[in-house]
């Protein structure tokens, strides 16, 4: 039986997340704390990032709901 090779997940840093979402650092932290944004992962003592696929899925879910502020 062949073993499955796990997919490699890309990690993006804060700058890329902010560019993709147009959100400030404080808004990202608030949404994350409320469970409304993907959780960051610790990369090192002073480095964090997010899985790109989770951020993309979050953006897609906003687009399906009509974007922020549309009561979705």
What do these predicted regions represent?
Residues 34-41:
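Short, solvent-exposed alpha-helical "recognition" segments
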Residues 66-72:
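C-terminal secondary-structure termini that scaffold catalytic or DNA-interacting sites
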Residues 1-33, 53-64:
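Polyanion-binding surface elements
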Residues 50:
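Exposed, tryptophan/tyrosine-rich binding patches on extracellular proteins
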Residues 41-47:
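Short Lys/Arg-enriched helix C-cap and helix-to-coil transition segments
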